[in-house]
């Protein structure tokens, strides 16, 4: 994997903002440029003008991010009552919030309903009955299993969702339980590169919409397309415009203007991923034998300080050090974290290249780390504190 150049990811003025914010701070820490989130939000709204954006809070649940998106008009998808409390604490009206986790305690459903939440995801009879009991009259959408894990870097359709036939049964049962069978949701997998994955999922949804209307007399009103839109890591991805055009085409092929259901998107990674740069120091450089050609580069950030998505080398972050700009020689490295856990290795098989001139104390910048880093950072594993975050705009 060849070394990168910083101008592949940032304009000079934008990169200068990050480096200025990093001056004089003890590593590791994450720098988040809120203006980049705002720009991305406006882009998504313009490309999906008829959709409601429900920001997937799990990507970065920081108050600074919530306040920004709330002021821009975003809705929010919560995965827990703890995220719910945070977004409500920012003054967001409950009508702008969905409870999108299909796995939730009965008492948490009750709590959310008491706070004004009336839109819930489900994928099982037990959860559906909990919603009926503790959030009577609420709108529910059933999450279905779809294809796409083969082309997603972070698959999400095993733990969540049910077979479309079961989803139909749940929607019928929802009506019998006094709930509103509102719609269907799916997720094609995070960092999904194949736009055709949405076409396959939407075909299943169209069949279910027609079945529910013709066989059960239930007119579903909403499709939740989830997230999955990719951001720029090591591998090149199509711009979001390509996804928007194709998905819009799929929808208009399936539904007339007067039949078009409400569309919900749950962007997370695609909204905030490009806003972050994680700054770390090189702690140690070593080799495992005198003849080993591969250097082990240990940094003061690892899986437990925010880089958990490198598990299995799934997400491949762009890794940058200023010496890349002048280096005349590079070599393959293993990148590992600082903890006393043998799994704390970010990249061993990917073949990352770093300058031979790299030294202990040099800075390493992990680009495109605005999503699923600070929210995953552990609390004091091996005594290391949670990842510090610096916000700029």
Describe the predicted segments one by one.
Residues 58-62, 79-82, 102-104, 123-125, ...:
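Active-site beta-loop-alpha junctions enriched in small/polar residues
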Residues 148-286, 346, 382-384:
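Active-site loop/helix belt of alpha/beta enzymes
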């Amino acid at each position: 994997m060849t070394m990168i150049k910083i101008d592949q990811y940032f304009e000079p003025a934008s990169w200068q903002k990050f480096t200025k914010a990093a001056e004089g701070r003890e590593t590791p820490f994450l720098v988040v440029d809120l203006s980049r989130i705002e720009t991305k939000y406006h882009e998504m709204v313009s490309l999906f003008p008829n959709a409601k954006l429900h920001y997937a809070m799990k990507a970065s649940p920081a108050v600074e991010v919530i306040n920004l998106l709330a002021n821009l008009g975003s809705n929010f998808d919560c995965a827990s009552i703890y995220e719910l409390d945070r977004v409500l604490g920012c003054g967001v009206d409950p009508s702008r919030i969905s409870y999108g986790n299909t796995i939730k305690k009965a008492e948490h459903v009750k709590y959310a309903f008491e706070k004004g939440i009336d839109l819930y995801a489900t994928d099982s009879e037990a959860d559906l009955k909990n919603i009926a009991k503790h959030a009577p009259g609420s709108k529910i959408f059933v999450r279905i299993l779809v294809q796409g894990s083969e082309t997603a870097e972070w698959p999400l359709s095993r733990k969540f969702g049910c077979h479309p036939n079961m989803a139909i049964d749940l929607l019928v049962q929802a009506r019998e339980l006094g709930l509103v069978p509102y719609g269907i949701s799916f997720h094609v997998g995070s960092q999904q590169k194949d736009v055709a994955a949405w076409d396959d999922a939407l075909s299943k949804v169209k069949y279910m919409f027609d079945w529910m209307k013709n066989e059960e007399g239930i007119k579903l009103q909403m499709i939740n397309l989830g997230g999955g839109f990719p951001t720029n890591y090591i591998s090149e991805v199509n711009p979001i415009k390509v996804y928007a055009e194709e998905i819009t085409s799929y929808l208009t092929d399936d539904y007339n203007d007067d039949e078009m259901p409400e569309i919900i998107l749950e962007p997370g990674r695609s909204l905030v991923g490009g806003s972050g740069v994680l700054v770390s120091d090189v702690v140690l450089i070593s080799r495992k034998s005198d003849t080993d050609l591969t250097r082990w580069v240990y940094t003061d950030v690892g899986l437990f300080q925010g880089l958990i998505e490198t598990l299995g080398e799934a997400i491949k972050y762009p890794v940058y050090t200023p010496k890349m700009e002048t280096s005349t020689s590079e070599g393959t490295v293993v990148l590992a974290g600082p903890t006393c856990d043998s799994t704390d290795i970010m990249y061993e098989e990917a073949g990352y290249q770093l300058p031979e001139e790299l030294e202990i104390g040099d800075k390493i910048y992990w680009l495109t780390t605005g999503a699923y880093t600070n929210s995953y950072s552990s609390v004091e594993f091996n005594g290391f504190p949670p990842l510090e975050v610096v916000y700029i705009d």
